[in-house]
Amino acid sequence: MNWIPNVQKRAFHYVLNRLALFSDLELDNMDISLGTAQKAALTNVKLDPDRVSLPAGMYMRSGKIDEVSVEMRLLGGAGIAVKIDGVHITASMKQMDVETATEHVEEFLERTTADLAASILSEDLSASLQIDPAEEPPLLGMGGSGISEALVKKVTQTVLSQLTVDVTNVHVTLFVAADDKMDLVVDEVRLRPQGGQEMALEVRGVKMKVMDKKARGTSAPVTAGSTAHATTGFTSESDSDSDTDPFSNAKKSLLQSTIFSHEEASSIYMSAIAESANLGFESDPLFGVFYVDTIDVLVFLGEEMRVSCEVGIVRASLDLLPTVILSLVKVGNGGSGGKKSRDSETKEGTAMDLNMSIKSISASICQLGDDWEFKNIDTNLLFSLSDISGSSGAFHKLQIGVCEVKRGSTRVFGFESDEKNTDDEEPTPRDSDILLKASSASFTLVLPKKAVGVFTIPDLIDVVSLITYLLSLIESKQQKAATMTERSERAGASKTTVQTNTFDFDVAGHKLYILPIRLSNGQMSLSRVSFGDVHVKGISFENSIVSVDKVDFDIGLPIVEELHQLLLPIIDAMNSAKNRPVPASVQTAPPKLLRIVEEPVNASSLVINVARVKGKVDLGGKVGVIEVVLGGISVTGPTDRIEISTVEIGRDLSDLGLSKKWLLHPLKRESNVVVELSSGQIQLITVKNCALEFYTELLELFGGKGDDTKAAELQESSSPDSSSRESSSGSESPPKRIPLQIHNCAVGLNPTNSSSSAQFIVKHVTCEIKPSPTFSMTSFIGSASLLLIDDASLVTPNPTDLMSSYLEQYTSVASLTATSISISTSPGNPTCININGDTVTLSTCADSTQTLIHLINSLKPAVELSGAKFQLETLDPFLNTFQDVDDCFFKAKNKDACESSCSSDNDDIDMVSDDVPNNMSFVESYYGGDKPSQSRKSGRQKMAESYTHADFLLDSDLDSLVKRERVRFEEICFEEDYFDKEEEDMPVMSRPRASSHDLASSNELLTPPTVVINIDLIHNIVCNFHDGYDWQYTRNEINGAVDGLKKRMKERPVVEEPPVMTTDLLFNSIYIQAKDEDDLDDVVGEQTEPAKPKEANKSRRGLLSRSSNPLVQVWLQGIACLLTVYAGLEDPDLPPGQVLNSLDVKIKDVEIIDHVPTSTWNKFLTYMRSRGEREAGAVMAHITMQNVKPVSTLSSQEVICHVTILPLRLHVDQDTLDFLTRFFNFKDVRTTAPPDETFIQKFDIRDVPVKLDYKPKKVDYSGLKSGKSTELMNFFILDESDMVLRRIKLRGITGFANLGQKLNDIWMPDVRRTQLPGVLAGVAPVRPLVNLGGGIRNLIVVPVREYKKDGRVVRSLNQGAYAFAKTTTNELVRFGAKLAVGTQNLLEGVVSTERAGESRDLDDSDLESTTKYYTYMGYSDSNNKLISLYANQPLGVYAGLQDAYSSFGKHMNVAKTAIHNLSEDISEADTAGAAAYAVVKAAPVALIRPIIGTTEAVSKTLFGVANEMDPSGRELARDKYKEAN
């Protein structure tokens, strides 16, 4: 029995090593005495970190026990009793995969017996026991061979079966990361054997506290000594390089200590532990997050482990618990994903049998107090689970008796038993709220009871905040682990089954009702979900695809606003939860754990399909009920992509006099709206094939003061919150941008009380919308077009492709390209709209132009004025009408009176040089003697003075002007210090104040603008005016009128002599007049398309259609426009003369191109180049308009307009003029005139110098007989006729049509009375003589003018002679060229048969004109235009000689060919008559063609000489004449 003490010592040594692992505890130094009871006590014992075995994922940094006592009693059955008090352990986390952690737990529970057996059966057992086997007698019949293994195990089990352990006051400090610290306190742990292989573990008072970062900031304070530890990475067996451990220096120091001696290593080791423990967390605040009162575990340690666990009350704080969970389960990629250890392979198929029961689990967002009860539980949600029982083995089962959520004493969520209200049965509630069963092949979740809940806004905020924070933790780790290896595929597939009862919730006063959910084999079905008046039907789920059959809703604007107010705090809570700092432990958490948490919530592969959504939205007010229909909705992600196939929005417009209209509808059966998302943020919205219908009546829905007041109140109530919210978030994140792309969409324009309609088609539009903090939108329109139709009822729509119906049945009248539009608005600032464009093109006929104008006018809303527009005032009966009449008005011949009056006011007599352009001497003397006005005169007196000055200037004699004393420079006094004066000392030059009607000129009447529309620049606006008619109605009316005239002509008596003219006027522009029935078609052709050749095989219907090419083009270049809106007509408290809006239009260049084929001229209107180059930045036309409210008590507005136009050059062909007259005089009888025409308070147009070329083609003798004196102009060709359309100020004009008539009535008499010499000087035969006379005049005027400047006689005579020679020579050369061209035209008229042989399609009547300065070149069906011989002039003498040589050679070749053909014709002639006919036919060509070539060569040469002398003549000819290429 000598071995018994050694066994006792070894058992005692084993217990101490297993339970305490004391440092430097040697077996030989232990004195154990034999007896009935042995007891040892140790105090302040330090633990060896290298020998302590902790659960998986942790290693100990330091440890200490206050008191340890071990008592061994081998007799009496007391066994071994271990009591430990005051355990203090500091540990850190390390990485380990989930499989290894699970195996480690099972191994930790089972290895006690095996370790003890290994200790007893060691190789040096005999030596350590000091027993001689030969001397030891047999024990219990085992012989002398030694101690058997079975005996050792039996003894070991006997010892362990009587081992009791009591541990009190356990305090574990766990460091998860550099800034995460946890404290775990256990009041008492008791381990008791229960007989056999059963052991009971009792745990009392488990408490956990963590550090609250909100109390100390985002990072923990680190001392100087621990700085290195916080930045050093932790090296593990895992392949993850991203995870770090701040406590790796402890292990590193430990490894380095092995090369020293025992004493040195111990010293270095303890210093390393002290260094790594100095992290400065002692002062950090700790808060309770987890508490368990009792845990009772019964373990059967057999071959199959059985565990029975009973847990009492569990409390957990959800405020910091997510950080704790993610930190504690810090598992990485240590496992290589598929590799298993040999031990784990041997343990496959064995499962631990676990039975567990929990009395209650309570969780809340609030923290636990010092008494481990929840703080402020009455104001926070409490999640409660009770009566929890479960079992685990081959089949897992979990049963939750009661599941509910409370806030204080109010129940928020829970389950209720279904009650069968019958007479025979009693209500039978079911036992459990939640049943869960799981195995390796199946998972079943059953909710047998009906879920009920009443959620308020605070409840939703708390729940959403918690969920959002959890998701943000997962998302932050997903971003960090993006470069990790892909997720391994799950082995096998499990069968999941979910069965629920109904859900009946009250969400902020709105009912949410969900019918039972069924999920089986990956297929989920749900018949209906209702939320208020929103009903979702036919929900199914299969293979990550959610399908919804139909969604119906009927909601009103108050509900929408209520839901909006409901969502605002929830969204704020989500944002605040997302912005909470993510713990470093979560940032460094291993990916595998997050994969486990991620898998249930990952929705990247989820697809939601909704077949149809239909419902009504009551927006309230005048807008009323809007019907919305969405079809084919597909949501991917669901935060990646939303696709809607069809979008329809409609409204019943019966209250507006219309039927039900779809305001938004698809054009094609394709995808209409696609929303691309990223992390819940909109990345791109694409809209395709949608049509938006605009009805003028819809504007009435948004009018009214009540709606404005309501909108203002709503904006006022929501703006502060939103602005503050945006301002707070704007500092943290950049402003949100919503990109939008629109492809192949249409905007329908449907005017009021009109049958016409238009479609604005956009091909491609890109937009970017910034909703906050200030709304702004920038868009770019690649290309768009405007389609028009006169009668929308004639359209036959194609339901499957409306776009093709529009393109086929509508007429394109306008298009635009490369246009950018930006809109910005902010509180307190006006709404600004900036527009830039490349080219805008209008292509219309006469009827479509009127339809377009009428449609634009009809799109304006009908304004209901609250006040009267006019009022009647009674004037004083004794009004003196001659009070403001100047007496000198009737004394125009008195020059002294005129001179005295001309110095009084020069406001209306500006641009004197334009009035008398050649009287330069008078201009100098006039401005030299001018004096500022000292008095204010009336408008009538100014007009009288202007006419007086005109008479005076016309009556002035050149000699009297020359005799005037010239101005000497020494008489001008310069004041050197003028600009050094103070501002108040400088004289102020101001214009005389305008009349009382010019109320808008005062800056006091300009309120801050509300809307500013700025067209920065549109490069080109092209207006194409086509001949013919676009509408079938117009063509039918013309054909009907012609057929009626034919019928009338057939019915008239034949005996009438002479035949009576039959006439008719159609559309106020087509005048039909014919004597014979056969001439009617020709008359119609000439009226509609006079420029086209007459073809016998061309029908009247073809002549009435739109021409392929425009006859007139209007080019506007460099258009800039500024529209400023200051106030509305109905705005209250407007002073008299308040400017409502102003329009400023500037046009850099204006040109009208003549494409009429019978016209040889190019530009109908252009800038007068003879005036020289324009100033930099000068515009050709400048128009300013202001709408003012003259009387504050009347609902009326008046227009004040100012127009400035640069000098104009006109080349007017009578055919072109007739076309334009007919084009703009067209009146459609179906369109009504606007009910109220604009009243023009004041119209001011400044002097417009004009130089006119006019080519008449025919004379209307009937009009001449009726007294139209303007027909006399058709007898003369005008060439460079000069006139000035003088400045006119008109007041009180109704309508712009009357304005044009008034201007004509004033300008024409003025031109005839005062400017007739300049007009007559432009008569074609007289113009060369006038130009020669101008040269002679320069021989006198130029020397006199130069002499007056510097007094040098010889230089003045030289300049006069040079001007005379240059002018005279140039005019003589050009006059010779004109004679040569005229001769050529006469000779070509003789060779008329040649023209017919060259397939000339024009009749001789087309050549019968007063002028014949044109020939036929380049004529074809595609380009029907005549080219004048004045066109294509050579640039100089050398070019003129080259053109002369080629022209002469061309005509000589024609003559040569004619002579060669003549010889062949004579040889082929059978008779002398035929030969003579051939000679007569070829003689004109053979004889006259060389002469024509000679005249053309002479004209080309002379034109070259003239352009060499005056290079500007080439540009003038290019503006006037069409060119061949």
Swiss-Prot record:
Q: What is the topology of this protein in the membrane according to its UniProt annotation?
A: Peripheral membrane protein
Query: Major place of localization?
Result: membrane
UniProt subcellular location: Preautophagosomal structure membrane; Endoplasmic reticulum membrane
Picking any one GO biological process from the record gives: autophagosome assembly
State if Coiled coil is listed as a keyword. Answer: no
Q: Where is the composition biased (Polar residues)?
A: 220-230
**Which reaction(s) does the protein catalyse, per the Swiss-Prot or TrEMBL entry?**
a 1,2-diacyl-sn-glycero-3-phosphocholine(in) = a 1,2-diacyl-sn-glycero-3-phosphocholine(out); a 1,2-diacyl-sn-glycero-3-phospho-L-serine(in) = a 1,2-diacyl-sn-glycero-3-phospho-L-serine(out); a 1,2-diacyl-sn-glycero-3-phosphoethanolamine(in) = a 1,2-diacyl-sn-glycero-3-phosphoethanolamine(out)
Q: Which domain of life is it from?
A: Eukaryota
Q: Output a single Gene Ontology CC term carried by this record.
A: endoplasmic reticulum membrane
**Gene Ontology MF term list:** phosphatidylinositol-3-phosphate binding; protein-membrane adaptor activity
Keywords recorded for this protein, A-Z: Autophagy, Endoplasmic reticulum, Lipid transport, Membrane, Protein transport, Transport
- Location of region: Disordered: 216-247, 712-738
What the protein does comes down to: Lipid transfer protein required for autophagosome completion and peroxisome degradation. Tethers the edge of the isolation membrane (IM) to the endoplasmic reticulum (ER) and mediates direct lipid transfer from ER to IM for IM expansion. ATG2 binds to the ER exit site (ERES), which is the membrane source for autophagosome formation, using basic residues in its N-terminal region (NR) and to the expanding edge of the IM through its C-terminal region. The latter binding is assisted by an ATG18-PtdIns3P interaction.
Q: Which family does it belong to?
A: Belongs to the ATG2 family.
Q: What is this protein called?
A: Autophagy-related protein 2
